Regions:
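Class I S-adenosyl-L-methionine
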Residues: 2-266
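A phosphate-binding catalytic loop at a beta-strand-loop-alpha-helix junction
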Residues: 2, 265-284
C-alpha cells in the first residue's frame, strides 16, 4: 500500500515532501517505487506474489514499472475494489462536471514465477431457484477428450469431462426423464444429495458442440473474478482511534491473504501504516 502520489505531500524523496507543484513529482515517485519493487522481487519466493494498491494518479505508470521489474509475463490481474464516493456539491453539479466521481481503486498483482490462486468463492445475496444448462464443449485442445457423446464427436476443442464421467451424467439425466419427471430437475438434484451431474443434447443440435449441454445446479456462491467491488478498499478513519485518514479495510486484506493456493505463506507489508495486514493475519 504505497503512497498514491496525490500531490498532498504523501511521500518523501531525498528528505523532502513532494507536492503537486513539483514538476518532477511523477518521475520522483517512480524512482521512489522502483528501488522498493526491486528489493521486493529479491524477497519473493519462486511461488511468491505481490499485491500493490494504487489509484488513478499513478496506476498507468505503476503498471509499466512493474512490467519492467517483474516481467510482463508475470502480471496476473488488476483487481478493482470499491472506493467510498464523496457527496457531490449539487451547486457545482448543476453546471456540469469535469469528471465522474471516482468509485474504484486498483490492486496490481504480479507473481515471481509459479504463483497459483485457489478457487475463491463469494456469497450471493440471493440464492437462485433455478439451475442452468451450459455448453459442454470447451475450446481447449486435448484430442483424448474428443470422444463420441450422444451421437456427436467434436472435430475441434474438447469435452469438459472425461468420458466415464460424461457417460454417467448422460445416464443420470435419462433416469431423471424416465423415472422422476414429476419433479423439477432442481428438486431431483436436491433429493439425491446435490451431487449428481447431468448431460443432455438438444434435438437437431449443431455447431462445434453439437448441442451437447451440462447442467449446473443452483449455488449460493459465485467464483470471484478481478471485480472486487463488493469490498470497500478503506475503512472510515473515525471508526478507529488511529491517526490515519484511510486505513485499509481488514476484510479486503483478509481476502488477499486467503487468495494463494498454498496453505502456508510468509507475509511482508512494506508500508505497514495502520497495521491492517497484521490485524487481518491474526484473524485468519
Amino acid at each position: 500500500d504505497p503512497p498514491y502520489n496525490t500531490g498532498n505531500k504523501d511521500f518523501v524523496y531525498n528528505d523532502s515532501y513532494v507536492d503537486s507543484e513539483d514538476s518532477y513529482r511523477h518521475s520522483k515517485w517512480l524512482s521512489f517505487m522502483e528501488k522498493r519493487l526491486k528489493i521486493a522481487k529479491t524477497l519473493l519466493s519462486d511461488k511468491g506474489v505481490i499485491f500493490i494498491s494504487i489509484d488513478d494518479n499513478e496506476q498507468a505508470n505503476l503498471k509499466l514499472l512493474c512490467d519492467e521489474v517483474f516481467g510482463a509475463d508475470n502480471f496476473r490481474n488488476t483487481l478493482y475494489v470499491r472506493r467510498r464516493t464523496k457527496t457531490l456539491n449539487l451547486q457545482f453539479a448543476e453546471n456540469g462536471l469535469n469528471s465522474l466521481n471516482v468509485g474504484a481503486e486498483y490492486i496490481l498483482v504480479y507473481a515471481r514465477n509459479g504463483y497459483l490462486f485457489k478457487e475463491m468463492r463469494v456469497k450471493k445475496k440471493d440464492l437462485p431457484s433455478k439451475g442452468s444448462w451450459n455448453v459442454f464443449w470447451s475450446n481447449a485442445d486435448r484430442p483424448t477428450m474428443r470422444y463420441e457423446l450422444l451421437g456427436f464427436t467434436p472435430q475441434t476443442g474438447q469435452w469438459r469431462w472425461a468420458k466415464d464421467l460424461a457417460d454417467e451424467a448422460v445416464e443420470n439425466y435419462r433416469d431423471y426423464l424416465y423415472n422422476h419427471a414429476e419433479l423439477s430437475l432442481e428438486e431431483y438434484w436436491e433429493q439425491t444429495g446435490r451431487s449428481k451431474k447431468f448431460i443432455r443434447r438438444i434435438p437437431n443440435g449443431f455447431g462445434k458442440n453439437g448441442g451437447v449441454q451440462y447442467w449446473v445446479g443452483p449455488s449460493d456462491t459465485f467464483l470471484r473474478t478481478s471485480n472486487w467491488t463488493d469490498i470497500e478498499v478503506s475503512q472510515i478513519h473515525k471508526d478507529f482511534e488511529l491517526p490515519f485518514n484511510n486505513p485499509k479495510n481488514v476484510e479486503l486484506i483478509k481476502e488477499i491473504l486467503q487468495a494463494p493456493f498454498y496453505k502456508t505463506s510468509f507475509i511482508l507489508d512494506f508500508f505497514a501504516g495502520s497495521g491492517t495486514t497484521l490485524h487481518a493475519t491474526m484473524q485468519l
